[in-house]
């Protein structure tokens, strides 16, 4: 749950206008993904991406990521939307991008995947659990294995690593610095300064 949300005040020709900080960032086409990725967070991110596409389908969108990961299907809804919309989505890791956060970081537009220098990036295989009858557990197990194959395939495509290398590296938690993530192919550049 989010605590205090800062507000900013802008002077316009019509007087002062106040925005919550997230609305102000959205005005600059910046979407902030922070915290655990679940259905609620994913719906909010998807809605913002769709809104920004409707506002200007030619202008890039910046997705800033500081996330420990979360639910695979929630993350895949963000991934599919990033690919569905016309604007390029640049991704920027601020702090950490772990699990589904790292996956989404790697899914930014080629040449537009960034990290700040002290951020940490971590990839691993899907986590899950099951209970119930043996046949139900088998169904869930097969679905987790299917999702693992899908995620590894996309990570291999995004990074340029072989599928075998991705499978090996995601077998356990695999942590990288921003520089290591660039060498691995998950990002394109480590940012030192905002050059806007």
Curated annotation (Swiss-Prot):
GO terms for cellular component: cytoplasm; endopeptidase Clp complex. It is found in: Cytoplasm. It is an enzyme of class 3 (hydrolase). InterPro entries: ClpP (IPR001907), ClpP/crotonase-like_dom_sf (IPR029045), ClpP/TepA (IPR023562), ClpP_His_AS (IPR033135), ClpP_Ser_AS (IPR018215). Pfam families: CLP_protease. Its EC number is 3.4.21.92. Keywords: Cytoplasm, Hydrolase, Protease, Serine protease. It comes from the Bacteria. The active site is at residues 99, 124. GO terms for molecular function: ATP-dependent peptidase activity; ATPase binding; serine-type endopeptidase activity. Its main location: cytoplasm. It catalyses: Hydrolysis of proteins to small peptides in the presence of ATP and magnesium. alpha-casein is the usual test substrate. In the absence of ATP, only oligopeptides shorter than five residues are hydrolyzed (such as succinyl-Leu-Tyr-|-NHMec, and Leu-Tyr-Leu-|-Tyr-Trp, in which cleavage of the -Tyr-|-Leu- and -Tyr-|-Trp bonds also occurs). Gene3D superfamilies: 2-enoyl-CoA Hydratase, Chain A, domain 1. CDD domains: S14_ClpP_2. GO terms for biological process: protein quality control for misfolded or incompletely synthesized proteins. Cleaves peptides in various proteins in a process that requires ATP hydrolysis. Has a chymotrypsin-like activity. Plays a major role in the degradation of misfolded proteins. PANTHER family: ATP-DEPENDENT CLP PROTEASE PROTEOLYTIC SUBUNIT (PTHR10381:SF70). Fourteen ClpP subunits assemble into 2 heptameric rings which stack back to back to give a disk-like structure with a central cavity, resembling the structure of eukaryotic proteasomes. Belongs to the peptidase S14 family. This is ATP-dependent Clp protease proteolytic subunit. It comes from Helicobacter pylori (strain ATCC 700392 / 26695) (Campylobacter pylori). The lineage of its organism: Bacteria, Pseudomonadati, Campylobacterota, Epsilonproteobacteria, Campylobacterales. The gene is clpP.
